[in-house]
Amino acid sequence: AIAGMAFFDSVESFNMIRGGHIDITVLGALQVSKNGDIANWMISSRGIGSIGGAMDLAENTPTVVVTMEHTTTNNEPKIVENCSYPLTSKGCVNLIVTDVAIIEVIYSDTDNIHLLLKETAPGWTKTDVQKITAVELIFQHLPKA
């Protein structure tokens, strides 16, 4: 074993998650809504996938980072007004990292949530990213493209 490494079973991992001992989690997603909701599983009749431990992680971890491609294979946006897949958790996402952008979810209050475009991938402009995002992004603090 490498120093600092730990091995544990799923029972212990859920105890750590549910006990609030995890500071940050990184989850994949099918969709993220403008309100920071995450959908990362689907109904089996609509495709593969099922519920796993993501609900526990999303609900019991203070910082939730989502990593995903920005669009589907059909070029549909994955950052959307409202998730069309079953929700994993509501209002939990803090940061979205896609193949073209890094977007911070800013929770001013429950009625005032913004998606701040923090960074674009090389060769992408803020306008390019906005065109493939289904909701409005804010650009303050972003260098002009």
Show which residues each predicted segment covers.
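Conserved phosphate- and dinucleotide-binding cores of soluble alpha/beta proteins
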Residues: 1-145
